[in-house]
Amino acid sequence: MLVRSRYIEKIRPFVGLDVVKVITGIRRSGKSVLLQQIQDEIAQNVDPAGVFVRINLEEEENSRFLSKGVVHAHVLNIAKKSRDRKVYVFLDEVHDMEDWEITVNSLRAKKNVDVYITGSNSKLLSGELASCLTGRYVDIQVTPFSFAEFCEAYNADGKRGDDEVFRKYLALGGMPFITNLAFREDIAGSYLEDVFSSILLKDVARRGKIRDVDLLGRIVRYVMTEAGHTFSAASIVRYLKKEKRPCTVDTVLNYLDLCEQAFLFARVKREDLIGRRILAVDEKFYVTDHGMRRFLVGGDAMRDIDQMLENLVYFELVRRGWHVTIGKIRSKEVDFVAERNGEINYYQVTYLMPSKETRNREFGALLEIPDNHPKFVLSMDPVDMSADGITHLNVRDFLMQESK
């Protein structure tokens, strides 16, 4: 089993502190396994004498814990018997529990209780939790495997990021259960389609009280097809009208918000790099698991390769803690403006640069930016084409770098 070290390192400083540790992310991205790994880390290296309570609220045998107050009473009973020993509470998919916010906050306030929860909806951290915890939580967002993690899981012989592994990653995506399927493409598609259906029904339609699931599915597939391209809700409405499925812009916007909350995809805003202001139109969406997109949209692993490389780079930047926008510099576009703790990096992403014209296009937008922050062009070209103060990197090499 692959240890998700990056996330454990993020959690470790908060173990035992008076904050709820909240792990969020798309369904089946490995939150439950990470929760177990955190428990193992505490038991082995932090507090071997600790008492551990683990409840998965999606499992049928734990259905009694969904009722108001049952988890609270159960944990307090264990804490009372534990005397001076710390009780570590791990609640999986906590949003299914009645009045979970009150229970979690009450347990957090107990001196000898340390609380960890998971959820598959970003709204877990909005009004629901924030109003109760008033800042007493830390959020760790989990994504499917990065390319580096995929290589570690895939390679028994120690190969790192070669052509075969990268093609597999492009084809299958990073959902951790793919490892249990021996990375077989012939059966991975069925699994990913089932995961998609589960997300659509449980995390989007049910939560948003959506009855027209067919319309929802059409909108999601449109977004997945256009991942990495700018488009508007109005363009989706026009597309649906041609498909004889008319709907309003407000409906599309509502459905997109719900899908974003369920981590199906991420919305990225555009930024004017001259006036340094966020633009209100033409956002982009990136798909949380590109393997799921491939099996839903169709085609082989190289279909829409420019879009998918951009997709990979976006999520890698997010994993590394960067806040990412799309840059606009006059009539040109910069794929990513990444900001972190006062640092700014600029990135252009493309498949290959076989001609001078292509190189001029990719480097040209970066050259117009009137500052001296680091600038990068990422492509699959094996030859270093760095020029004019702009660093060129191979995409695979970038994805395999230590977090920077």
Predicted feature residues:
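Hydrophobic positions on the alpha1 helix immediately C-terminal to the Walker A/P-loop
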Residues: 34, 38
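Conserved lysine of the Walker
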Residues: 31
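Short glycine-rich substrate-engagement loop in P-loop NTPases that contacts/grips substrate
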Residues: 55-84
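Accessory nucleic acid-recognition modules appended to NTPase machines
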Residues: 183-343
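Hydrophobic anchor at the beta1->P-loop junction of P-loop NTPases
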Residues: 23
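Pre-Walker A adenine-sensing motif
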Residues: 2-16
